[in-house]
């Protein structure tokens, strides 16, 4: 546990840098992130010290499937549970490779045609995990509307 907490500063910096790119672009784009756009996320393929196993990765934005929503991540905290899970000390090990981030807040940028509960522009709580990313594409049930 001490090793994890000593490396929290490095992990915080990594998450801040990823989050900064999302915040920096928030005011400069007026539409949805389109399929094929390159987006960043934090991931890991082995458990261990978060400061050494976490990587910022880039990949093409995922296509929406029926029932899916695309959300631009606005903020995602670093939870102690995230750090413990990355280190393999949480009690439930993730399927590797994994994407950390148990919660966050985002804005809906696109919805599939069959989604009625969420609308473009709506702020949502990210409840589907993998929140250390610039955007998430997941079933609408993984997002809770915010007032």
Give the ranges of each region predicted by the language model.
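Cleaved targeting-peptide boundary
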Residues: 26-35
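Cytochrome P450 core scaffold surrounding the K-helix E-X-X-R motif
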Residues: 81-87
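Short structural boundary motif marking the start of a folded domain
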Residues: 35-42
